[in-house]
């Protein structure tokens, strides 16, 4: 008994010593060369310090196209640590629809952040309900909304809904998806399975089975893959963003809708990048005539909250009636802060006068590009647009040099493949700012063509 008590006391003493040996007032031990690096946000010569630290603490998953560290933005302009300003024709890849630090947007963020930012979906919140009301009121096709946090999540939810309905109605074999060449649906496992580019897919196999790729705008290739007993959904971008701004034709989409209807499968339109005013229409799919092409599901994200993370899935009653509590969910989706901001952005963009301006500025940009094509027909091979401020130009060479040249002239543009430049500026961009872009493009083309002589 005495020995047992002695052992217990020894253990207690060791435990107590280990506690009291900790000096809680001392500074934590940090990794050398990481957290002891002194950074100064106001130092105009501090760009390299931030980039060096970035390389040490942030995973290398992005090929950064520049050595710029941005500090703030206003409207169509971004400002870096050195004090230089850049005209932004990428808008965060079609996200900042109202530009950077829009006054009304900033006011809504500030006001809502003082009230309620996050709640969870165990409870109701006013902004989510009001945003859903605005969105559903704007379309005759869709009846319910599911909120997510990104385009990938929106597409993932859409695919899950389609699979559940397909299996419930057609048995375990009716789970297959048809996607399209050059399409981009996202990077999570389900949406990645519907993304065509092999460099995104091949290192993560095996992916979700039963996904087949048809040729974009080729209805015969879809027919070869379609099966009434196996296909549960077709997912398609009305305008492909990553795929070089190729647009689906009206005839193809109407035939696709008819084919889906005949085979009892759902039609999903992915408007993550091309929706909410980007094409000059509120919804990109309305170009196909909603009487002859009536999608069952539409996914949205990028511009909806003007820079805050949000995604949305709009569905018909036919779909909504099959989805029950527990079939899908999200912790952050539909939060009061992002939905209040989304409500402001959506109601602003959906105004007819706003959309008319987008159409006019899109035409102004396209007309300017056509003039350049007339001047340099061997350099600009094609101009791609269905309207609005979502315009691509295909060049006869790799566009990386143009991206670098434009950056040197303080204009930011982004590619959509090796030979296509994608222009998706803030929808609030001015014609004077478009002129600045056109001048830089002209100077670049003069330079390229003089080097060919």
UniProtKB/Swiss-Prot annotation:
It catalyses: N(2)-acetyl-L-ornithine + 2-oxoglutarate = N-acetyl-L-glutamate 5-semialdehyde + L-glutamate. Its main location: mitochondrion. One of its GO terms (molecular function) is N2-acetyl-L-ornithine:2-oxoglutarate 5-aminotransferase activity. Its EC number is 2.6.1.11. Pathway: Amino-acid biosynthesis; L-arginine biosynthesis; N(2)-acetyl-L-ornithine from L-glutamate: step 4/4. It is an enzyme of class 2 (transferase). It is found in: Mitochondrion matrix. Its cofactor is pyridoxal 5'-phosphate. GO terms for biological process: L-arginine biosynthetic process. NCBIfam families: argD, PRK01278.1. This is Probable acetylornithine aminotransferase, mitochondrial.
């Amino acid at each position: 008994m005495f020995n047992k008590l002695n052992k217990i006391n020894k253990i207690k003493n060791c435990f107590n010593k280990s506690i009291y040996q900790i000096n809680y007032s001392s500074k934590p031990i940090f990794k050398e060369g990481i957290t002891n690096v002194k950074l100064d946000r106001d130092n105009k010569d501090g760009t390299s310090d931030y980039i060096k630290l970035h390389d040490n603490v942030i995973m290398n998953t992005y090929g950064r196209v520049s050595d710029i560290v941005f500090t703030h933005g206003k409207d169509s302009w971004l400002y870096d640590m050195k004090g230089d300003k850049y005209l932004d024709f990428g808008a965060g890849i079609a996200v900042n629809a109202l530009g950077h630090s829009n006054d009304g947007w900033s006011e809504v963020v500030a006001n809502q952040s003082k009230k309620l930012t996050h709640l969870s979906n165990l409870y109701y919140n006013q902004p989510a309900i009001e945003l859903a009301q605005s969105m559903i009121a704007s379309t005759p096709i869709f009846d319910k909304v599911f909120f997510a946090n990104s385009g990938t999540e929106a597409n993932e939810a859409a695919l899950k809904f389609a699979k559940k309905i397909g299996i419930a109605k057609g048995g375990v074999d009716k789970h297959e998806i048809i996607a399209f060449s050059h399409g981009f649906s996202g990077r999570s496992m389900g949406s990645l399975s519907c993304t065509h580019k092999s460099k995104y897919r091949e290192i993560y196999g095996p992916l979700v089975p039963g996904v087949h790729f048809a040729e974009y705008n080729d209805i015969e290739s879809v027919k070869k893959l379609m099966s009434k007993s196996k296909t549960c959904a077709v997912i398609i971008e009305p305008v492909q963003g990553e795929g070089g701004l190729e647009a689906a034709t009206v005839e193809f989409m109407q035939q696709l809708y008819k084919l889906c209807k005949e085979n009892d499968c759902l039609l999903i339109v992915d408007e993550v990048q091309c929706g909410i005013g980007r094409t000059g229409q509120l919804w990109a799919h309305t170009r196909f005539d909603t009487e002859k092409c009536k999608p069952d599901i539409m996914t949205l994200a990028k511009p909806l909250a003007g820079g805050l993370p949000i995604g949305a899935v709009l569905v018909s009653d036919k779909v909504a009636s099959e989805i029950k509590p527990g079939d899908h969910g999200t912790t952050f989706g539909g939060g009061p802060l992002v939905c209040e901001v989304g409500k402001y952005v959506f109601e602003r963009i959906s105004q007819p006068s706003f959309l008319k301006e987008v159409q006019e500025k899109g035409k102004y940009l396209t007309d300017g590009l056509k003039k350049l094509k007339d001047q340099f027909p061997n350099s600009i091979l094609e101009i791609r647009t269905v309207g609005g401020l979502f315009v691509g130009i295909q060049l006869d060479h790799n566009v990386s040099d143009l991206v670098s040249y434009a950056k040197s002239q303080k204009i930011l543009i982004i590619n959509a493949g090796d030979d296509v430049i994608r222009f998706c500026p803030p929808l609030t961009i001015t014609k004077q700012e478009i002129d600045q872009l056109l001048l830089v493009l002209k100077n670049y083309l003069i330079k390229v063509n003089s080097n060919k002589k």
